[in-house]
């Protein structure tokens, strides 16, 4: 597949004429002009001088406006549409970067520099590697902007003379990575050739590694760590000489997936069993030596991260993190919360009837298999063997749960729910399903199309072990911990 942005066009885009055109296009979009009108404007077309530059500048302007919602330096950064879609939320990137404090860090699959900008604030020295040269060019520009704001050294044009070094190459072949702007091919024995010269700056042995591999297979996202690009088992094998690794994964990954527990690491990627320097590295640890952290931002489960070596939280096997959203508390009290599981999951809570309160546990804790621990601490029981829903008789106030008073438990039939609604004066209604194969919109029509909206009455259709019920809860009187 051809790159979204060629290196030649990227170099023009980061030049003063390219940046000025992106500023003009962004201002025109801000003023309400549409993309077609801008793209056919004679002065814009002349400034771009060719169709590829024009398309890149317009795409960068559109992406910049979208990036403003999350990125502090959006009005100076340069994105492609795809790169922006793939970029981590800056709040999450900053959380990840905390583990790399004052370290020499190699950021693989670095894209246009979103994660690297966060690492720039914590690392002592930073090396980035990106296979797509066009993206690497944008990354150097974006990191220069970030470095200026942070008042740290700016990315060097070649290796060896700056706090940040930007390289072009494959995450599984760091010996072949070349500094950005070096010639693509370097003769053996010359500076930058494999085995000598500046390329040694891109090694990962004894360093801390950060990598956010591609998680798309065709046009679909994958939860399977064996299908990422590069695959997780290949990354662990190739960089087993690293002091520690952080590999960003899809939020639905299983913490006990074989690729994360030592299986499938004999893939032939040219790595020695003990790393490039002969020392035992992250790939040689018993039981995989991996902590899988599930990160939730506000009410949304964002990602999982596999941590190895010195980056692992002691003996943690799985952990859950609640991050508050910058524009709202999101985690109950606006603070960061963490829970850690250091061994096998604890015993499941007993199954019981629907109590006075229905309790939902934060998705990050559920993925980390910590919901039963939370239930035990709060004195709650399960409603079904294969549901993470909990229940009890008192409203818990805990950052890891959302709890709602139960108003009624009735049959999960539209007629029964419609009859209950006729007998009770209620505000807006929200319909949610828990394991029940029902289309909420169809169910809403079948119960008489009551007013819809959040923070009112919730009709919770729950699949239990032997039947399904409709649990009517009062969201307005509930506790919203996350």
Model-derived segments and spans:
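SAM-dependent transferase fold signal centered on methyltransferase-like domains
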Residues: 1-482
């Amino acid at each position: 597949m051809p790159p979204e942005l060629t290196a030649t066009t990227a170099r023009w885009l980061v030049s003063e004429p390219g940046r000025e055109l992106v500023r003009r296009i962004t201002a025109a979009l801000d003023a309400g002009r549409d993309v077609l009108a801008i793209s056919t404007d004679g002065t814009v077309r002349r400034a771009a001088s060719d169709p590829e530059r024009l398309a890149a500048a317009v795409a960068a302007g559109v992406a910049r406006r979208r990036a403003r919602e999350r990125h502090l330096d959006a009005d100076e950064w340069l994105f492609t549409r795809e790169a922006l879609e793939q970029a981590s939320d800056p709040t999450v990137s900053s959380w990840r970067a905390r583990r790399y404090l004052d370290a020499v860090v190699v950021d693989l699959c670095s894209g246009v520099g979103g994660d690297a900008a966060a690492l720039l604030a914590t690392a002592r020295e930073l090396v980035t590697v990106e296979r797509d040269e066009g993206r690497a060019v944008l990354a150097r520009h974006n990191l220069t902007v970030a470095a200026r704001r942070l008042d740290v050294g700016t990315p060097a044009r070649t290796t060896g003379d700056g706090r940040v070094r930007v390289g072009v190459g494959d995450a599984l072949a760091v010996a072949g990575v070349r500094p950005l702007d070096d010639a693509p091919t370097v003769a053996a024995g010359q500076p930058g050739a494999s085995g000598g010269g500046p390329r040694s700056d891109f090694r990962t042995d004894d360093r801390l590694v950060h990598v956010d591999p591609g998680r798309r297979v065709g046009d679909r996202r994958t939860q399977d760590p064996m299908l990422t690009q590069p695959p997780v088992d290949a990354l662990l094998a190739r960089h087993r000489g690293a002091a520690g690794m952080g590999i960003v994964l899809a939020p639905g990954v299983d913490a006990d997936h074989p690729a994360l527990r030592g299986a499938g690491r004999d893939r032939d990627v040219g790595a020695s069993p003990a790393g490039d320097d002969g020392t035992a590295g992250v790939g040689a640890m018993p039981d995989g030596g991996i902590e899988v952290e599930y990160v939730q931002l506000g009410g949304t489960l964002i990602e999982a991260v596999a941590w190895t070596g010195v980056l692992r939280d002691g003996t943690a096997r799985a952990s859950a993190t609640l991050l508050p959203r910058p524009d709202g508390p999101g985690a109950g009290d606006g603070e960061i919360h963490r829970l850690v599981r250091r061994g096998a999951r604890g015993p499941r809570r007993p199954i019981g009837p629907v109590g006075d309160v229905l309790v939902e546990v934060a998705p990050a804790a559920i993925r980390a298999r910590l919901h039963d621990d939370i239930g035990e601490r709060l004195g709650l029981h399960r409603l079904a063997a294969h549901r993470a829903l909990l229940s009890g008789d008192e409203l818990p106030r805990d950052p890891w749960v959302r709890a709602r008073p139960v108003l009624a438990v009735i049959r999960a039939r539209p007629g029964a729910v419609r009859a209950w609604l006729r007998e009770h004066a209620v505000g807006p209604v929200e319909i949610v399903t828990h394991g029940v194969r029902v289309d909420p919109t169809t169910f809403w029509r079948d119960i008489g199309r009551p007013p819809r909206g959040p923070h009112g009455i919730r009709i919770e259709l729950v699949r239990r072990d032997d039947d399904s019920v409709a649990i009517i809860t009062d969201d307005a009187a509930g506790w919203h911990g996350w």
